[in-house]
Amino acid sequence: PKKAEAKFSIKKKDDAAAKVGEDAQNAAAIKAHPLLARLQLGGGLSTVGYASVRDTAAINKIIYSEVAKRVLPSDLRLLWSAKPADNLKVKNIYELHALKVTTTTGRAPLEGDVITDAKDEFDQMGSPVVSMKMNTEGARKWAQMTKANVGKAIAIVLDGVVYSAPRVNGEI
């Protein structure tokens, strides 16, 4: 019995030491690479990376810093998804989107004033979608935007967060 207890306590000490070592490695990685230690790169289209909700504030400090403003392109906007990514096994992971500003004013090319009607519906696969109707000017501009961006994403942004950024498959 004493040997079993000794083995158990040694293993427990080893587990604790491993945890301390892992924590030290994580702290060193965060110190050496504060952004890359918190943001998992990848995603495709407009998504440049993923991060835990608990890391978004630290990432924001970096990506919205004065240094970042000097080195990142002036037409780049980095914005978080409105909701956690639903296609991941881990919960509370948000997508960071890279959006290109395409107007001289920095405003969206289309805004809410062109929407004449919007309602919740379900698509043919049973997934929830928002159906929108636009006025003539909005519909014309939307057709131009989708035609010019086939194969790329167009982000739907409200109050500074990305609600959707689907791939454009053709002019709409």
Predicted features by range, described:
Residues 170-172:
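A short acidic/small-residue loop/turn micro-motif
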